[in-house]
Regions:
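Core alpha/beta catalytic barrel or barrel-like domain that forms the active/cofactor pocket
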Residues: 68-77, 83-101, 121-141, 171-191, ...
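A generic structural motif
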Residues: 42-48, 102-103, 143-149, 194-198, ...
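Acidic/histidine-rich catalytic neighborhood
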Residues: 184-204
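Active-site-proximal structural scaffolding
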Residues: 66, 107, 153-156, 183, ...
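Loop-centered beta-sheet repeat module
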Residues: 150-158, 163-174, 185-192
Length: 278
């Protein structure tokens, strides 16, 4: 157990400032000699979970739920206050997605270094790609169990931030940093499955599970990230924040049923496209 000054992080008052750090996962730190990265939970001084400690609320008694998170982000140029490589002539997006070449791709060195460091740390990064907007990137992680999935994403984010320091670049997680323009925002699409989804072989079961999300749209949106209303407009591969839909291969739906799930005889996973990048 360790402690820190919670008043300096706005997590405790100055007169009772101690917060505790409870180690929950450890990873080798590839960029330090004999170093380690320790994921922790924040506790109050009396040992109870701090109100910011969302991890402690996870009921994770087994690893039946598998998660694949797609973390989108912008590499943000602090000099121009625009995405790295953002075109001065407002070139329409389209040439940047999964692109290559100096006129299309900006910041690959950062992305590649982040991938290597994550893999060396034992974080299960499944892939990376340049995203739809200029200076926008994505990496994907996979884990079994909600706590491990969250731990690996947070440590991967930390490593990305630390690498960006060397380039004087900001990692921008705002879901719509370019505002109401004709440019994509950033999400963290959540792919998920359990034994039922992986084995049922039933279109009806998939539709029943998707329909179970319909009555709890507000509850989902409430925990899917700040400023998400700016991103979920119904444009740029999103469904409107006030609507709910699902469909096969439909990236304009709230929940996408991947074509591979269908082609595997309705055995696979679902993708909730609503969570924001932050």
């Amino acid at each position: 157990m360790w402690s820190f000054d919670g008043s300096s992080t706005l997590q405790a008052p100055g007169g009772s400032s101690d917060c505790l750090l409870k180690p929950v996962a450890i990873y080798p730190d590839p960029e330090r000699k004999n170093g380690f990265l320790v994921m922790t939970e924040v506790l109050n001084a009396d040992g109870t979970a701090h109100e910011s400690n969302g991890r402690s609320t996870i009921d994770d008694s087994d690893n039946d739920f598998w998660f694949g998170f797609e973390q989108e982000y912008f590499l943000w140029d602090t000099e121009t206050n625009l995405p790295l490589g953002f075109p001065k002539d407002q070139t329409p997006q389209g040439q940047f997605y999964c692109s290559v070449g100096g006129a299309n791709t900006f910041g690959r060195e950062i992305m590649d270094r982040h991938l290597d460091v994550c893999l060396d740390a034992g974080i299960n990064v499944e892939g990376t790609n340049a995203e739809v907007a200029a200076g926008q990137w994505e990496f994907q992680t996979f884990a079994k169990g909600a706590q491990q999935a969250g731990d690996e994403m947070w440590v991967a984010r930390y490593l990305l931030e630390r690498i960006a320091e060397d380039y004087a670049i900001k990692i921008e997680y705002h879901p719509k940093p370019l505002g109401a323009t004709d440019w994509n925002g950033s999400g963290m699409h959540a792919n998920f499955s359990n034994t039922t989804l992986r084995t049922c072989g039933s279109k009806e079961t998939y539709e029943k599970i998707c329909e179970a999300f319909r009555p709890v749209v507000d509850e989902c949106i409430a925990v899917y990230g700040a400023y998400n209303d700016q991103r979920l407009t119904g444009d740029h591969e999103t469904q409107s924040i006030t609507e709910f839909s699902y469909g096969v291969s439909d990236r304009g739906a709230s929940i996408r049923i991947p074509i591979m799930t269908v082609e595997s005889g309705w055995k696979g996973w679902l993708e909730d496209r609503r969570p924001a990048s932050n």
